[in-house]
A protein has these predicted regions:
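Hinge/lid segment of periplasmic solute-binding proteins
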Residues: 44, 111-164, 188, 215, ...
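Glycine-centered hinge/linker elements that transmit conformational signals in sensory
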Residues: 190-193, 232-262, 307
Length: 439
């Protein structure tokens, strides 16, 4: 352990030693590890297969790690793990079809609070999720909220997508900002000056899973807006805070933002930032490694910062990824063993390390992992989880809040205001849509 730039740096060896002590080591594990240590023959018939559906990752190297691990597990157990990777926005549709048809992928890795919508087709995986959480320091509230529905674990938390603001340091300095703005009013001022110089801010408002929702939910919360009360039933979106955010955003759109953002998806702002078309964008750390490998000028000039504070504080909507085991799976025991196996710390760490701060593990054990301080420009991504909320806050995560997100109600509310609908009318529309869901 060393002290560097005022920060305690923990070596990987020190971290793993502490982690092993905390979890009791691998010797405490049963299941597949126990079988392999004992040299027992696999208990599954020849030709046994598991179908695993997941999104194409924005950090492709993580997919290779997982694919290699799936192949390793299959080889050891004499089974085949068939991994299918598709676009992230296509996963919910495929998952819904699997639940409806009672057939399809055995395991589905899915984002956000969608497990609540699909809970009827999911196996209770508490016997997998609970031991993992206990062994690894407990789950973050956000991770559990999006995977726990109706009093049971309908999915095993896998990761939380880190999200903050990517920006060009030199361009901000040119307009008088030597550090990223602390408040939304400062953000507006910065953006106005940047756009005047041909370097607008870029925000996505299309129907895409991550960035549009992250921005719109986060901005709403920063100004004190919420969808529902703590009871999870009473719709309270039509309040002063929401309206303030809804009035601010169209002004920022005209003054500060790239006006192509209405049709952007989660990859559009990445491309625009790397091309130098925009100066600032909210995103995961997926732009940074691409810049490092292919756009050295962008890489040297970019940095990351937390989201600005509003009157109510600083808050984030962070996408989560969870693993659902479907009821139609004929090999549920094997599927659970596979999930336990690749979520064990010695294998999960390899995936997490490869993700390079893109993903926050769902459990608290990893907070002091050295990956977070490997590059000072990425440290901000570790702490965004502290200010994260789930859709439907202050109520509990639920099927209703999942439906609201799936229908992009908040995103469309902001998009309507951008396109000229008076903010008051856009807010009334969104409130009415929420009331239909929560009725």
């Amino acid at each position: 352990m060393s002290q560097r730039h005022g920060r305690v740096t923990v070596s990987r060896r020190t971290f793993l030693k502490a982690a092993a002590a905390a979890t009791g080591g691998a010797a405490a594990l049963g299941g597949i590890p126990g079988i392999l240590r004992a040299g027992q023959a696999p208990a599954y018939a020849k030709g046994t297969k598991l179908q695993y559906l997941m999104q194409l990752h924005f950090i492709p190297a993580t997919d290779k790690v997982f694919m290699d691990q799936a192949a390793e597990f299959g080889k050891q157990m004499g089974v085949e793990i068939q991994v299918e990777r598709i676009g992230q926005n296509d996963v919910p549709t495929r998952a819904a079809a699997a639940v409806e048809m009672k057939s399809g992928p055995d395991i589905i890795q899915i984002q956000n609070n969608f497990p609540h919508l699909l809970a009827d087709g999911a196996v209770d995986v508490g016997d997998v999720a609970e031991p993992i959480g206990k062994a690894q320091g407990g789950y973050y509230d956000l991770s559990k909220a999006n995977a726990f529905s109706g009093g049971r674990w309908v999915a095993v938390p896998h990761d939380v997508l880190a999200w903050a603001w990517n920006y060009r340091e030199s361009w901000l300095a040119e307009v008088g900002y030597n550090k990223f703005p602390e408040t939304w009013e400062q953000f507006r001022d910065m953006g106005k000056k940047l756009k005047a110089k041909g370097h607008p801010v870029g925000c996505a408002f299309g129907h895409s899973t991550n960035d549009p929702n992250n921005y719109c939910y986060g901005l709403t919360w920063c100004f004190g807006g919420m969808e529902v009360e703590k009871d999870g039933k009473t719709v309270i979106l039509d309040k002063k805070g929401t309206l303030e955010a809804l009035k601010l955003n169209p002004a920022m759109w005209k003054e500060a933002m790239d006006e192509g953002g209405l049709s952007w998806d989660d990859a559009s702002n990445n491309r625009a930032f790397l091309a130098g078309s925009i100066s600032v964008t909210g995103n995961s750390p997926s732009i940074y490694p691409v810049a490092r490998d292919k756009f050295p000028d962008v890489y040297q000039d970019m940095n990351h910062a937390p989201t600005p504070r509003g009157p109510a504080g600083r808050f984030y909507q962070l996408p989560t990824t969870s693993i659902m085991l479907m009821k139609h799976c004929k090999e549920q025991k094997l599927a659970k063993e596979f999930i336990r196996w690749f979520m064990a710390k010695e294998r999960y760490e390899k995936w997490f390390d490869t993700a390079d701060t893109f993903a926050i593990p769902p459990t608290k054990m990893w907070y002091d992992h050295p990956v977070w301080v490997r590059d000072r420009k990425n440290v901000v991504f570790r702490d965004v989880i502290k200010d994260a909320r789930w859709p439907g806050f202050a109520g509990p995560a639920s099927r209703n809040s999942s439906e609201a997100m799936a229908k992009y109600i908040l995103v469309d509310m902001y998009a309507k205001a951008i396109q000229g609908t008076p903010p008051e009318e856009a807010l009334k529309w969104a409130t009415a849509e929420l009331k239909k869901i929560y009725a």
